[in-house]
UniProtKB/Swiss-Prot annotation:
NCBIfam families: prfA (TIGR00019), PRK00591.1 (NF001859). SMART domains: PCRF. This is Peptide chain release factor 1. Residues 285-305 are annotated as: Disordered. It comes from Shewanella frigidimarina (strain NCIMB 400). The gene is prfA. Residues 285-296 have a biased composition (Basic and acidic residues). GO terms for molecular function: translation release factor activity, codon specific. Methylated by PrmC. Methylation increases the termination efficiency of RF1. The modification N5-methylglutamine is found at Q237. PANTHER family: LD18447P (PTHR43804:SF7). Keywords: Cytoplasm, Methylation, Protein biosynthesis. SUPFAM superfamilies: Release factor (SSF75620).
Length: 361
């Protein structure tokens, strides 16, 4: 292992001991915010520190076995040979483990997420497919015991959604779903198609992380244009008689957010502001990532969120993820919410990219 990596690990070991000491300090214990922050840091350091301690012991065992190979006694050398092979395997395994643990983590992975699904090309069929995607994500959320809350919905005339925005609350929601951002294409025969021709439709999916109030970008009220209107259901039927729905336009960026799911204008405004904060933060995050990764391949399109990432082919029962050239004939399982068969390989590929970048550095 590189000397620079060893030094970094030794620094983390020292920091772990420092945090542990602080957690037993009465002054820190009385400051709940600081105590909570240090507890989180300690839990984040725990795995890498534990592995590094095991690595240090394995290194000692390996060095000792190597010395024993120089012994004059034949029996001792034979014993050392076995120990040498075994300790070398353990050392290599722990080295690989530490490299993965040292990969930079997205601080937003543990946050809640906003999921936005919009019908694209394909008219009514695209809206119906947006409904199918919503159902797929709903099943996945149920399996993970995450809560879903509809923020805004614009129903399709013949089923599905022209647009639906939901908040997903649960541990690791954003970290799991963030790779879903992009264009999703469906190939199938619509129910209204009398001649059995396969049609192609598309939807775009955007996944944003929730921005905690304490970390939210400051939004100047003077930069906002707020409109109220009556919330409406499918086909334009009014569901209440008051102007409870909210449309907020952030003038500098041109970002527009609507929220009409709650009966209270106050609640709709609060939800719209949280979505607006997430979208503005996403724009800022994108700028930062683009600056940092101008020469690095990204699994999710860096600028164009509509770039096609996946195709769902119903006649063949096939789903293909174009970012990693993965094709599975398990469409029914995926549409029932078994998304891990797609998400796990993408995460592994992303991890491999980061390891390669680490090696280059």
């Amino acid at each position: 292992m590189k000397e620079s990596v060893i030094r970094k690990l030794e620094g983390l070991l020292e920091r772990n001991e420092e945090v542990l000491a602080l957690l037993s300090d009465a002054t820190v214990i009385s400051d709940q915010d600081r105590f909570r922050g240090l507890s989180k840091e300690y839990s984040q350091l725990e795995d890498v520190v534990s592995s590094f301690k095991a690595f240090q012991q394995a290194q000692k065992d390996f060095d000792y076995a190597k010395e024993m190979l120089e012994e004059d006694d034949l029996e001792m050398r034979e014993m050392a040979q076995d120990e040498y092979k075994q300790s070398k395997q353990v050392l290599e395994k722990l080295e690989d483990e530490l490299q993965v643990l040292l990969l930079p983590t997205d601080p937003n992975d543990d946050t809640n997420a906003f999921l936005e699904i919009r019908a694209g090309a394909g008219g009514d069929e695209a809206a119906i497919f947006a409904g199918d995607l919503y159902r797929m994500y709903s099943r996945y959320c149920e399996a993970n015991r995450w809560q879903m809350e509809v923020m805004n919905v614009n129903e399709g005339e013949h089923g599905g959604f022209k647009e639906i925005i939901v908040k997903i609350s649960g541990d690791g929601a954003y970290g799991k779903l963030k790779f879903e951002s992009g264009g999703h294409r469906v190939q199938r025969v619509p129910e209204t198609e009398s001649q059995g021709r396969v049609h192609t439709s598309a939807c775009t999916v955007v996944v944003l992380h929730e921005v905690p109030e304490a970390e939210a970008i400051s939004i100047n009220a003077a930069d906002l244009k707020v409109d109220t209107f009556r919330a409406s259901g499918a086909g334009g039927q009014h569901v209440n008689k008051t102007d409870s729905a909210i449309r907020i336009t952030h003038i500098p960026s041109g970002i527009i957010v609507e929220c009409q799911d709650q009966r209270s204008q106050h609640k709709n405004r609060a939800q719209a502001m949280s979505v607006l904060a997430a979208r503005i933060q996403a724009v800022e995050d994108e700028k930062r990532r683009s600056a940092e990764e101008t020469t690095r391949r990204s699994l999710v399109a860096s600028g164009d969120r509509s770039e096609r990432i996946r195709t769902y082919n119903y006649p063949q029962g096939r789903v293909s993820d174009h970012r990693i050239n993965l094709t599975l004939y398990r469409l029914n399982e995926v549409m029932e919410g078994d998304l891990n068969v797609l998400l796990d390989p993408i995460m592994l590929e992303h991890q491999a990219d980061m390891l390669a970048a680490l090696a280059d550095d």
